[in-house]
Amino acid sequence: MTIRKAKLNDVPDIHRLVNHYAGERIMLPRTLTDLYENVWEFTVVAEDEGRLVGCGALKLYNQEVAEIRSLCVDETLKSKGIGREVMEELLNEAEAFGLKTVFALTIAPTFFEKLGFREVPRERFPTKVWRDCLRCERYTCCDEKAVTMELADRPTKLGESAPEATEVSS
């Protein structure tokens, strides 16, 4: 399995994968135009034979905050750790940018909580709500939960608790 940044020729496969879940009302649809304009946000997982099997995007909001978006894995390969690997890479990117906080709106908060995220009120991210949520057809009946992670508290390995601080005496 190879984890890498998305390329323009990945867009049709990202579109297929994301919109498969959008059709099941698990995530929001993305147009081809939107994906081409924002392909740089995506990290992609590809199997050795080059088949795209998972993706996720890091949407920057300001110098401190980014959103994890469009995180999904081919339905036939769920529960194999691919989503966790994509998330790990997205968090590495967030840290490389010097961000402090990442968040997601999701109908699967348990997945994120297992990785060290915690549920918070959606109103904590007003830019997201005003930019995207108000235009969503599901705004008035949204069932997504907001989850967040402070990168300073990020576990060394996703799914494990952050190490306890220890005192060092001289």
What are these regions (language model features)?
Residues 125-170:
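C-terminal "cap" of GNAT-fold acetyltransferases
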Residues 100, 106-133:
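Conserved active-site alpha-helix within GNAT-family acetyltransferase domains
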Residues 1-2, 96-102:
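Short active-site oxyanion
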